[in-house]
A protein has these predicted regions:
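Structural preference for beta-strand elements that scaffold enzyme active sites
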Residues: 69, 134-136, 174
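N-terminal catalytic cores of peptidoglycan-degrading enzymes
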Residues: 3-10, 16-127, 235
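Solvent-exposed, acidic/flexible segments
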Residues: 65, 99, 130, 146-154
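Short glycine-rich beta-strand segments
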Residues: 75, 138-142
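Second-shell loop/turn segments in exported
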Residues: 58-59, 103-104, 141-151
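Short coil-to-beta-strand
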Residues: 128-139
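Basic/polar, cationic surfaces and motifs that engage anionic cell-wall
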Residues: 25-46, 143-236
Length: 236
């Protein structure tokens, strides 16, 4: 989508979030403007991702095939460049010490700019237990509430997420926050010490706010929401 058209989409989304306008728009969700900013993902990193997937999920592949989940994150940093510089080097992550390095498919900046770092056909390490079936979206910022209170960033995030939902056939109940990972029915972790590992970003309470806004946008475009949320007891 051209930048001016993308701006119009974000403006319309922001207006909807503000309560202005309620007309139903049926059809395909427009693709938001996405800036391509790929991180290096050469054969070595792909092989490391396949080895990781074999250890943790029992599948020997780096391909992300038919993802079922979208996981929302925040970066605990203030600039896109700091996020990019964290994800680009293929080094063991500082928390769990494994390769490949952490990454996310998309980053939504504070001004509403959407960056794509990795194709959605490639696994990224962003959520323990779900990387084999999840698209990761990072938001530049330090808290859920900071992002929820930023109209441009929130509008871009919702438009991206809804577009991905329609493109990939992902249901609303499977749009989750990182903090909700353990209760996802898709959570799978073969390495026992990691089965309770999660993060504090995007709690259920804040994701309920996010999902309500996403549902309102989905209804306007006629995107099916799917069945009610299904949560499981953490297997740890």
């Amino acid at each position: 989508m051209r930048p001016l058209a993308a701006l119009a989409v974000l403006t319309a989304t922001a207006a909807l979030l503000a309560g202005a306008g309620s007309a139903r728009i049926t059809g395909t969700v427009p693709r938001p403007h996405i800036v391509q900013k790929p991180i290096p993902y050469p054969a070595k990193r792909r092989a490391e991702m396949a080895a990781y997937a074999l250890r943790h999920y029992g599948i020997d592949t780096w391909h992300l095939v038919h993802p079922h989940v979208i996981v929302e994150h925040y970066t605990v940093s203030e600039t896109f460049s700091s996020v990019y510089n964290t994800f680009a080097p293929d080094v063991p992550d500082g928390e769990l010490g494994e390769l490949p390095g952490d990454c996310s498919h998309f980053v939504v900046d504070k001004d509403g700019t959407i960056y794509q770092l990795v194709p959605t056909t490639i696994m990224c390490r962003h959520t323990v237990g779900l990387n084999y079936t999840a698209i990761g979206i990072e938001h530049v910022g330090s808290s859920d509430r900071e992002i929820l209170s930023n109209p441009r960033q929130l509008a871009a995030s919702l438009q991206l997420t809804l577009w991905l939902m329609q493109q990939k056939g992902i249901q609303l109940r499977n749009v989750i926050g990182h903090n909700e990972s353990l209760t996802s029915p898709y959570h799978k972790e073969l390495y026992a010490p990691w089965r309770c590992q999660t993060h504090g970003d995007w709690t259920r309470a804040d994701m309920d706010v996010y999902r309500a806004k996403l549902a309102a946008l989905a209804r306007r475009y006629g995107v099916p929401l799917g069945p009610a949320a299904r949560r499981v007891t953490p297997r740890c």
